[in-house]
């Protein structure tokens, strides 16, 4: 059985491959030795650049509390620099939800089953 770190890394790599298969240039950002990183992936396509943090979730709710302070600071600076909205890619059961950062920030906690519009393949990311 994989530990949480390996499960997370596996999903980050999977998400990078999914984006690459959809024509994005996607790059996994390696964590620093202390484990910190601003977000997990950067993806670029047709002049759009996306910052994406990948999370796995075993229950049906996802909370803003799952984002670390350095990730929130990085997303806020990303936006101040005039970039597109960052996303949190959440894997739950067999689905991936692409949750816009501002949506999670405004709602604090979301029930994943209520986000059918954010499922991978539905949201035009």
Where are the language model's segments positioned?
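Active-site-adjacent loop/helix micro-motif of nuclease/hydrolase catalytic cores
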Residues: 58-72
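Short connector loops at helix/strand junctions that flank enzyme active sites
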Residues: 36-38, 47-51, 70, 81-83
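Active-site metal-binding core of divalent-cation-utilizing nuclease and nuclease-like domains
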Residues: 25-47
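Mixed-charge (Asp/Glu-Lys/Arg
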Residues: 73-76, 107, 124-125
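Conserved catalytic cores of phosphodiester-cleaving nucleases, focusing on short active-site segments
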Residues: 41-43, 47-60
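Acidic-basic catalytic patches of nuclease active cores, encompassing PD-(D/E)XK
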Residues: 1-32, 96
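Nucleic-acid nuclease catalytic cores
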Residues: 76-104
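Charged phosphate-binding loop/patch that engages nucleotide di/tri-phosphates or the phosphate backbone
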Residues: 109-125
């Amino acid at each position: 059985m994989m530990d949480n770190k390996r499960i997370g890394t596996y999903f980050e790599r999977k998400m990078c491959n999914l984006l690459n298969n959809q024509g994005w240039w996607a790059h996994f950002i390696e964590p620093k030795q202390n484990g910190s990183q601003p977000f997990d992936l950067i993806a670029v396509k047709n002049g759009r650049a996306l910052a994406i943090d990948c999370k796995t979730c075993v229950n049906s709710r996802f909370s803003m509390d799952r984002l670390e302070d350095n990730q929130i600071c990085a997303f806020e600076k990303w936006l101040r620099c005039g970039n597109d909205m960052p996303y949190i890619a959440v894997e739950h059961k067999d689905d991936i939800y692409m949750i816009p950062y501002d949506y999670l920030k405004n709602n604090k906690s979301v029930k994943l089953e209520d986000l059918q519009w954010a499922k991978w393949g539905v949201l035009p990311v």
